[in-house]
From Swiss-Prot:
Organism: Bartonella quintana (strain Toulouse)
Keywords noted in UniProt: Ribonucleoprotein, Ribosomal protein
Protein name per UniProt: Large ribosomal subunit protein uL13
PANTHER family: LARGE RIBOSOMAL SUBUNIT PROTEIN UL13M (PTHR11545:SF2), RIBOSOMAL PROTEIN L13 (PTHR11545)
Similarity comment: family membership: Belongs to the universal ribosomal protein uL13 family.
Superkingdom, natural source: Bacteria
Subunit structure: Part of the 50S ribosomal subunit.
GO CC annotation, single: cytosolic large ribosomal subunit
Keyword Ribosomal protein: yes
InterPro entries: Ribosomal_uL13 (IPR005822), Ribosomal_uL13_bac-type (IPR005823), Ribosomal_uL13_sf (IPR036899)
Length: 154
């Protein structure tokens, strides 16, 4: 029996929607990263984008455990000398684009490179419960019910 290798033309992508309200950030991000990569499928092939399209709603209601809400820092550099900047998770979640916390967590769990960037384009994160993907008829996934540690009441 030969090893199965999925071809890009044979890929069938599903649309799934996940409600992130009261879900632990890291556990949600790990689940979403596996879905985006296609590792949940028996047809997983490392060099082919055969993951699902994932929609995450209510990203502003995510939960961080411990003191990460106030202590976790996100760094970036402007490119100028001494231009290192930082923001806490609290500042981002209470700011203009709270969905970026989820996007960044998932991005850091996907391998870097051309394939990783293509897989990341299949992630759609929204701060509220509204999303423009009703036409895709996404299947709802309850990540909180998979394991009791996935959900925390804030």
């Amino acid at each position: 029996m030969a090893t199965f290798s999925q071809k890009p033309t044979e890929v069938v992508k599903k649309w799934v929607i996940i409600d992130a309200e009261n879900l632990v950030l890291g556990r949600l991000a790990a689940f979403v990263a596996n879905r985006l990569r296609g590792k949940h499928k028996a047809t997983f092939t490392p060099h082919v984008d055969d993951g699902d399209n994932v929609i995450v709603i209510n990203a502003d209601k995510i939960v961080l455990t411990g003191k990460k809400y106030t202590d976790k820092k996100y760094y970036w550099h402007t490119g100028y000398i001494g231009g290192i900047k930082e923001r806490t998770a609290r500042q981002i979640l209470e700011g203009r684009f709270p969905e970026r916390v989820v996007e960044k967590a998932v991005e850091r769990m996907i391998p870097r490179g051309p394939l990783g960037r293509r897989q990341l384009r299949n992630l759609h994160v929204y701060a509220g419960s509204q999303n423009p993907h009703a036409a895709q008829q996404p299947e709802a996934l309850d990540v909180g019910a998979l394991n009791r540690k996935n959900k925390r009441i804030a």
